[in-house]
Every structure is written in structure tokens, then in C-alpha cells.
């Protein structure tokens, strides 16, 4: 008789001579060995990390082999009970998520009690939809919030904290997020708990913590009195041991902009997984859960459910990388109960005005340079994209060497590229570039910005290149316009001061780029006009940049206006605009995302290669 049992892990017991024969059999080598941990004292013990699904597979395998050996297989009551309990646990968890999202009437009384507790503990009240999202995250303990950028995800998390502070002695939030989101978390905490709980923040990137050891020491000795601890993704690995010591029952762990954790089994993913493993409450926030492919959810789900992933989901990396329609349907069905997602429309944010697209005709010189670039880079569309953007900003940039790896932020995915272009143009072309005046598009942007400023409207101008930002600052400054720049080289403390000055009215124009300032910065209280001088097909950056001025908190009737500058060239095949092609692509990707939200599924966005093929479809 063979006996399968459970005593903390699965075991197989059989007579010693049969066990010895089994251990050298082809059945063991081909079927069981991958699951086995050790064989000793007449017992085969299976790996402790196996899931109940693995146990069911082992039972089926052993049943077939027992029949072949004409012996009885007994599955113990303890093993059956463990499997049944796991199935029931996951079923209950999944059912609760669905009931919360459907606002099941039987949960109404508990929701109202939750709402009363949260409202009593917050100075700034949550909207009804935000309160349901907060209730969902609290009840699920580990979940994701995929609400669109600008829909108040941070406040919903703070509502969860307010409830747990009152009911479960929670005393701090640890937030892992990009540095440029630190200010938003501090501002939101201060606003939500004004007069109730003062902000006591530990920012491990503050100037006084210059070394890794100083940061680790701060977490060990200064964190106890803090209610908000801020760490960026890059720094987690260096202070992981100190952070893990904080993961007690009084800590809420938040991963904000969790789409930053892209690469499967990469450093960010492994650190996040380790940190989340012992946390009781974990929330993952992102407005763009699947920016590129379904593989993007692999890390997210492992962070939230490290021990349950195989049982709850079980999707392999190859399966997520190239999903069939059936796989996509299965992923969405399995994932639905574990995330909430709210649109700005549901929260009553007034709709933005229709985009104002401003067409600018290219000069003869610009048309000639486009033809040269078209011939030179027809086999490298990313290089062509970057070079045309440079032409439209400052043609002199075409004479500089180009390392395409420096422009990966233009992409929506993590495609690797290391090609370097050394810009070996002929003397004739160099002369053409040297004698080129300011680009037509640049002049139109300065004109539009000045017009809006003269109407007493604060303005954000979005660029891609730091060179564009600096030249635009010089041009606007020469016209007496007060402007400041925010890009990667600007220290975090200086960025925060610039943003505060902009909000206070000391700055008329803010010049920046999406990969520096697109995330988690709120400027909607003072600014309602944004100009896009340069833009790429990175939908994440576009949506997040738009939401700096269009987000929860806008009063009814408040306008929001976006301006897109588009330079139009004359080619042999007629008029063509890179800006126009990119803009159309972005609108299509945004439509796909919003349609997916309406249909309650997670969207998959095109790859960068597909984007480039579409954008240059009208040029080649």
C-alpha cells in the first residue's frame, strides 16, 4: 500500500524495498523527481514550496503508477483537508473581490461602518467611488488599484490607512515609488490628515542621508516615530534588510507606479518580492497595468501573492509573452477579483476640452533635411524618429553623435538598443544645418506660450530634449517671461521648490519633460493649459503628463486645454507629419485603454516596433 500524507509538506510512504525500487525507476526520474525534496527513513518528502495544484498532480501520477503496480494508493484525510482548505480559501478570496467590486448589498452595512471610521479620521473626505476603492483594498489586504492617473489613488490608500490606524493599530505607511512622487505623497498626507495627524516623514533620499549606511541607520533608528517612509525603487536593494524589519502588522506597504517593476526576475522585482513577502497589507498602484504586454503583470502578481501565484493564476512567462485569445480571457477572468479600477468620469472630473492641434508648415530647408534623414535612416526607424525630433527642435543637434540607448524613454517597452550614430554628413549638409534658422515649430511654440502668458494663464510646456527646454527658457526669458526648468539633472529639493513657486504664481511657465515630471505631481489647482512641443508614442508618459493638470479636485466647469504642435513636411508623396502620425497613434492607444476599462478587461498595448511601423507607414 502507498500512502500520501501531509504534515506541513506532502509525503509518500511505502515499503522500503518498493521505495528503493521506485527511486531508480523511470517513473520517478521522468515524473516525480521534479517535485521531490528528499528520500529518507522510508519516506519520500516533497518540496515545501509546492502548491495544492502540484499536490493534485502528484496524486494523479501516483494513482496511475499504483494501478500499474497493482497496489492501493491511500490519500490521507489531512492531505485531503489541506487541499480542500486551500481551494476554499482562494475561492472565498476571489468571491470577496468580486462581491466588493459589484457592491453586493450584503456588504453595505460593513461599507457604511468603514466609511464612518474613515471620514472621522480624515480632514479631507473621499468621494463615494474612492471610498469603495479604499474599502476594497482594505478588505482584500493584498490587492492592486489600476485606476487611471489623476483619479485619486493616493487618497484612497490614505483612507485605508485611516481605518487601519483606528481599528488595527497601524502606525505607518512605507511607500516605494519614483523620487518625483515623494512630494505628492507628503502633500496628500498633509492635506488628508490636517489637524488630525501631523506628517512625520522619513525620506531616505533627503540631503542628510548621503550614503547607503546612513540610510540604513535612519531606517533602523529614526523610522519608529515616522508615519510615512519614502524609498525609491533603485534604493530598495541597498536598504532591504532594514526595510524588512519594518514589515510588522502596523505597517502598510505601498508600491506606487508599480509598472516600473518591469523586467521579470530583475533587481527591482526581486527586491520588491522579498520586501512584500512578510507584509500583512500590500497595495500596488498604477494607472497603466499593462503598458506593453501581459508579462507586465507577472511581477505585480508575484509581489502581491508570492505564495499563491501558482494556485491563483499559474500563467507561465511564455504563455504571457505570446498569449492566445483563450489565455487573455483566462488572465482577465483570474485577475478581475484582485484589482479595482476607477475612471475620472466616475469621479465627476470635468472633461477636458477637445485638443487644439496647431499645424506648422516646414520651411524649404526643413523639407530638404527631412529627405536627407529619410534616405540615411530608412533602415533604422528609431534613429529616424529621434533625428526628426532633433530637426524640429534644433537642427544643429543633427551634428551630434547619437546613442540610441539614451532615448529608450521614448519607447513604451524595454526593447534594448545600443546603436550609436556618429552623424557623418557631407559638407553640403553640414552647411545647410549650420545656416538653418530657428525651426518653424520652435518659433510657433514660443509665440503660443507668450500669448497664453499675456492672458495671465500659467503654462506647462512639455519637451523631450533637455536642449529644447534650455533653449526655450532662454527665448522666453528674453521676452520677460518668468520660467523655470525641471529635468533629470535638477536635484529633487530644487524641483520641489520650483513646483511650489509655480503653484504660488511666482513662475509663469514650467518647462519640463514627461520622463522626469509625468508621475504623481498635482498642478491642476493653478494650471489649465499645457503645450506639447515634442512628444513620443510612449502612452504612459502622455497620459501621466496630461493628468498633471486634469485630475480629481477640479471644480465643475473648469476647462483643461492641451495644445499639440505639429510640423508638416512636403514629401514626394504629399504632406506628412511625424507629430501627426505619433499623435494619431497615441489617440488610438488611448482609445484601446479606455475601451478596455469599459469592458472590464486589461488592455495590451502595441510594441515599439509596431508603433514605428505605423508611424512611418506614410513616409516609406
Over which residues does each language-model region extend?
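Conserved Walker A/P-loop ATP-binding site and its immediately adjacent core
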Residues: 156, 170-191, 293-296, 464-466
Amino acid at each position: 500500500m502507498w500512502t500520501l500524507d501531509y504534515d506541513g509538506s506532502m509525503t509518500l510512504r511505502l515499503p522500503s524495498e518498493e521505495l528503493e525500487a521506485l527511486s531508480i525507476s523511470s517513473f520517478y526520474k521522468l515524473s516525480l523527481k521534479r517535485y521531490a525534496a528528499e528520500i529518507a527513513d522510508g519516506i519520500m518528502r516533497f518540496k515545501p514550496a509546492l502548491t495544492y495544484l502540484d499536490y493534485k498532480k502528484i496524486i494523479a501520477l501516483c494513482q496511475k503508477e499504483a494501478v500499474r503496480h497493482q497496489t492501493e494508493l491511500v490519500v490521507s484525510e489531512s492531505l485531503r483537508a489541506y487541499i480542500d482548505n486551500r481551494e476554499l480559501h482562494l475561492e472565498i478570496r476571489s468571491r470577496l473581490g468580486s462581491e466588493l467590486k459589484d457592491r453586493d448589498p450584503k456588504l453595505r452595512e460593513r461599507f457604511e461602518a468603514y466609511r464612518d471610521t474613515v471620514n472621522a479620521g480624515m480632514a479631507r473626505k473621499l468621494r463615494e467611488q474612492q471610498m469603495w476603492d479604499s474599502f476594497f483594498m482594505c478588505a482584500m489586504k493584498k490587492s492592486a488599484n489600476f485606476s487611471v492617473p489623476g483619479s485619486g489613488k493616493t487618497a484612497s490608500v490614505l483612507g485605508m490607512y485611516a481605518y487601519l490606524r483606528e481599528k488595527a493599530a497601524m502606525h505607518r505607511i512605507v511607500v516605494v515609488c519614483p523620487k518625483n512622487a515623494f512630494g505628492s505623497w507628503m502633500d496628500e498626507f498633509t492635506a488628508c490628515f490636517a489637524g488630525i495627524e501631523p506628517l512625520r516623514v522619513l525620506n531616505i533620499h533627503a540631503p542628510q542621508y548621503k550614503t547607503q549606511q546612513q540610510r540604513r541607520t535612519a531606517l533602523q533608528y529614526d523610522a519608529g516615530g515616522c508615519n510615512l517612509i519614502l524609498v525609491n525603487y533603485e534604493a530598495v536593494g541597498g536598504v532591504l534588510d532594514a526595510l524588512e524589519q519594518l514589515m510588522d502588522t502596523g505597517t502598510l506597504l505601498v508600491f506606487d507606479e508599480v509598472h516600473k517593476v518591469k523586467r521579470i526576475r530583475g533587481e527591482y522585482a526581486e527586491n520588491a518580492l522579498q520586501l512584500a513577502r512578510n507584509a500583512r497589507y500590500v497595495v500596488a498602484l498604477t494607472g497603466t497595468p499593462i503598458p506593453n504586454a501581459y508579462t507586465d503583470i507577472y511581477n505585480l502578481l508575484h509581489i502581491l501573492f508570492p505564495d499563491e501565484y501558482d494556485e491563483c493564476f499559474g500563467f507561465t512567462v511564455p504563455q504571457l509573452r505570446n498569449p492566445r485569445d483563450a489565455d487573455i480571457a483566462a488572465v482577465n477572468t483570474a485577475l478581475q477579483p484582485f484589482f479595482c479600477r476607477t475612471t475620472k468620469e466616475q469621479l465627476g472630473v470635468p472633461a477636458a476640452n477637445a485638443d487644439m492641434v496647431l499645424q506648422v508648415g516646414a520651411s524649404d530647408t526643413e523639407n530638404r533635411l527631412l529627405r536627407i534623414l529619410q534616405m540615411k535612416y530608412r533602415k533604422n526607424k528609431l534613429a529616424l524618429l529621434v533625428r526628426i525630433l532633433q530637426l524640429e527642435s534644433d537642427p544643429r543637434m543633427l551634428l551630434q553623435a547619437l546613442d540610441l540607448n539614451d532615448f529608450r524613454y521614448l519607447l513604451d517597452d524595454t526593447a534594448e538598443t545600443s546603436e550609436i550614430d556618429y552623424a557623418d554628413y557631407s559638407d553640403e549638409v553640414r552647411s545647410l544645418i549650420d545656416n538653418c534658422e530657428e525651426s518653424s515649430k520652435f518659433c510657433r511654440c514660443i509665440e503660443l506660450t507668450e500669448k497664453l502668458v499675456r492672458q495671465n494663464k500659467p503654462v506647462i510646456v512639455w519637451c523631450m530634449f533637455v536642449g529644447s527646454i534650455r533653449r526655450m527658457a532662454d527665448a522666453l526669458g528674453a521676452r520677460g517671461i518668468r520660467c523655470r526648468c525641471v529635468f533629470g539633472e535638477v536635484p529633487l529639493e530644487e524641483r520641489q521648490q520650483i513646483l511650489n513657486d509655480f503653484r504660488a504664481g511666482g513662475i509663469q511657465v514650467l518647462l519640463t519633460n514627461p520622463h522626469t515630471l509625468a508621475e504623481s505631481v498635482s498642478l491642476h489647482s493653478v494650471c489649465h493649459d499645457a503645450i506639447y512641443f515634442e512628444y513620443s508614442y510612449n502612452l504612459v508618459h502622455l497620459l501621466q503628463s496630461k493628468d498633471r493638470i486634469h485630475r480629481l479636485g477640479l471644480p465643475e466647469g473648469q476647462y483643461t486645454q492641451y495644445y499639440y504642435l505639429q510640423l508638416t513636411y512636403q514629401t514626394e508623396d504629399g504632406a506628412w507629419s511625424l507629430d501627426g502620425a505619433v499623435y494619431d497613434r497615441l489617440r488610438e492607444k488611448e482609445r484601446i485603454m479606455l475601451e478596455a476599462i469599459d469592458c472590464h478587461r486589461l488592455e495590451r498595448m502595441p510594441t515599439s516596433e509596431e508603433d514605428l511601423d505605423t508611424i512611418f507607414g506614410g513616409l516609406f
